[in-house]
Amino acid sequence: MLPATASRPSAEAETTACFSVHAAANPGIMPRVLELFAKRGLVPTSWTSRVGHEQDLMIDIQMQGMDGNLTDYVAACLRQIVGVEVVLVSEKRQSRAIET
């Protein structure tokens, strides 16, 4: 039997930053994009890249647990990379139950 002070679930949002980078299909772009995460000690949760029909490079990156200020800063840095044309940023929140 559980004691009277048993844990009860509460919702806490877990945030995932999502970046969509559109750039010229240049092999030097991918390491420069990854470097922005690596030099902060971060390994992206998900990384997908593909070359489109018009020889443009599309990179989709997800980074779990990244706070909003760092997300905005990394997005600004991505936009400064030569050859990067567009950087879109969004945020996914997933609620999870926590025992308290």
Name the predicted role of every residue range.
Residues M1-T100:
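A conserved regulatory-domain signal marking ACT and ACT-like small-molecule sensing domains
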